[in-house]
Amino acid sequence: MKKSYITFEVALMKPYAVEDLPKNKIIEFFKLHWGSPEMVTSSGIYDCSALDGFAVINEEDKILGLITYLIIDNECEIISLDSMEEGKGIGTSLVQEVENLAIKKNCKIVKLITTNDNLLALKFYQKRGFILSQIILNAVEKARKVKPEIPLIGNDGIPIRDEIELIKVLN
């Protein structure tokens, strides 16, 4: 029964392109959930408010989920994914929207980077066909030199040290 509920929820969600939303709304979202729109990973430094992406919006015009991505050559990299209500299919619908676009753009893979403490993300992506492709040891220490507000301790009291790259090969 729960599975049909999730499927029903996903079917009702229509992700909007972030370019169709007010820029200040996107910036405020990233400030609230990440401290700033700036994302620093081993793959680069990004202004998430300037990236392409999709958002799920509720009836009150509140962002329930937002994903940003970057396409370079035949690779699509998910830079950020946030879902405000877990277990309702928001993250799944956003990832699927990016995968569909990546296929249309002839990308061979979708990839992303998360940190070693983000066990929920590791579970989420692996359940959706992503595989671990690389561990970048001490990458977060380097990122803190650019963005010192990155916390030392993350989810479940786990020290944030390493980045983990996940990939999904597209057919």
Please describe what each predicted stretch is.
Residues 80-82, 111-113, 165:
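Short aromatic/hydrophobic contact patches that present stacked aromatics
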